Design a protein with these regions (language model features):
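Glyoxalase I/VOC metalloenzyme domain signal
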Residues: 1-155
Length: 155
């Protein structure tokens, strides 16, 4: 209600959608390597896309205050974006306890006319775009520790 009163109804719609979806992947966040959205704002403005930017923070398990910014396009079929954290909380050379080393591929569906915008926002070859809706699949690179062979896991 507060977002709607502040004229941010489209952001509220995104949150409402997130609340209503079933468990699993349903959206996509693109992370840049900067602390601002200068490049991304120019791309969205050039393509006639409105957006909302907000600051965010949280305390991590090491009791550090992590800060970053979020950009929410009003168009719900575009991914939202985040800047890098002010402190890098990501462990080096980390392999998840389930054996996942990294994300190998994400298939994300959207409208045909939005695909060029997303390609301009994200040049990472991990992201595969198609005409459709939301995240279709995620492929992980997984290490099997017993024989150290690499396996792909699909979800």
């Amino acid at each position: 209600l507060i977002l709607r009163l502040l004229g941010k109804g489209k952001v509220a719609e995104r949150f409402k959608h997130w609340k209503s979806v079933k468990e699993g992947f349903f959206g996509l966040c693109l992370e840049n390597h900067k602390t601002n959205f200068d490049k991304e704002q120019n791309i969205l403005i050039k393509n006639g896309q409105n957006y909302f930017i907000t600051n965010s923070n949280r305390t991590d398990p090491a009791n550090r205050i992590l800060k970053w910014k979020l950009l929410f396009p009003y168009e719900l079929k575009l991914p939202f974006l985040m800047t890098r954290f002010n402190i890098d909380p990501k462990p080096k050379n980390f392999i998840h306890p389930n054996g996942v080393k990294k994300i190998k591929c994400i298939s994300f569906g959207t409208d045909q006319n939005l695909i060029p915008i997303i390609k301009e926002l994200c040049d990472d070859r991990t992201l595969k775009l198609f005409v459709g809706k939301d995240v279709k699949s995620v492929t992980y690179e997984k290490i099997k520790t017993a024989d150290n062979n690499v396996y792909d896991v699909h979800s």
